[in-house]
């Protein structure tokens, strides 16, 4: 009787051990499946964050470069017909001054946002800071777009003039000035495109949380 009880106890222990192993194996397989499905999502989130950082870095060069190019633009020429020295600089035109201010503000913000963007690369679960960046990114996009649009009208008048209003073009005399403000305008519109991509990138990143 004692041997039978002993055998039954051993069999019960064996059954419990097998059940424990099966449960452990099931949990291991479930955790491995979670790991397999989690890793691609983590890689994609990090990739989106890295792309956002790169876009911000290029946008910094676009905005600050445009502001510096426009803000240091001036030219002086001698009018042979009137024998006077003619001068022109960006501050003579309010739209160009607004252009410089808009790009400078946006460039300063983008520089300050770079550390936050780096933080998002290592902390893919951050949500509040992403919402703040998305809102401010949209405001900066509107600011730079308005500055570039306002400057475009002035640059066009400088090149083509307006015969109806009797405004002659000035680029025939101030060709260096016009070339520089035109180049600055191109850089600013490139920054507008980059800011649009940044907003889209931020929205996609936020939607994945």
Swiss-Prot record:
Stretches of the chain found on the membrane's Cytoplasmic side: 1-49, 117-130, 205-209
Keyword Protein biosynthesis assigned: no
Membrane-spanning intervals of the chain: 50-70, 96-116, 131-151, 184-204
Signal sequence, start to end: none
Carbohydrate-modified residues: 162
Record's bilayer topology term: Multi-pass membrane protein
Extracellular side: 71-95, 152-183
Alphabetically ordered keywords of this record: Cell membrane, Glycoprotein, Membrane, Transmembrane, Transmembrane helix
UniProt cross-references to Pfam families, sorted A to Z: CASP_dom
Major subcellular location class: membrane
Family: Belongs to the Casparian strip membrane proteins (CASP) family.
Assembly and binders: Homodimer and heterodimers.
Descriptive protein name: CASP-like protein 1A1
């Amino acid at each position: 009787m004692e041997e039978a009880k002993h055998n039954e106890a051993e069999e019960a222990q064996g059954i419990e051990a097998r059940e424990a192993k099966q449960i452990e194996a099931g949990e291991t397989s479930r955790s491995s499946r979670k790991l397999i499905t989690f890793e691609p999502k983590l890689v994609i989130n990090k990739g989106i964050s890295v792309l956002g950082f790169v876009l911000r870095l290029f946008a910094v060069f676009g905005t600050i470069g445009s502001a510096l190019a426009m803000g240091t633009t001036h030219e002086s020429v001698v009018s042979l017909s009137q024998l006077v020295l003619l001068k022109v600089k960006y501050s003579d035109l309010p739209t160009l001054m607004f252009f410089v201010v808009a790009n400078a503000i946006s460039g300063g913000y983008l520089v300050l946002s770079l550390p936050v963007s780096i933080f998002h690369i290592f902390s893919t679960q951050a949500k509040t800071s992403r919402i703040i960046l998305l809102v401010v990114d949209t405001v900066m996009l509107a600011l730079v777009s308005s500055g570039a649009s306002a400057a475009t009208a002035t640059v066009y008048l400088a090149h083509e003039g307006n015969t109806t209003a009797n405004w002659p073009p000035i680029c025939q005399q101030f060709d260096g000035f016009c070339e520089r403000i035109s180049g600055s305008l191109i850089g600013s519109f490139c920054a507008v495109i980059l800011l649009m991509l940044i907003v889209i990138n931020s929205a996609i990143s936020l939607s994945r949380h």
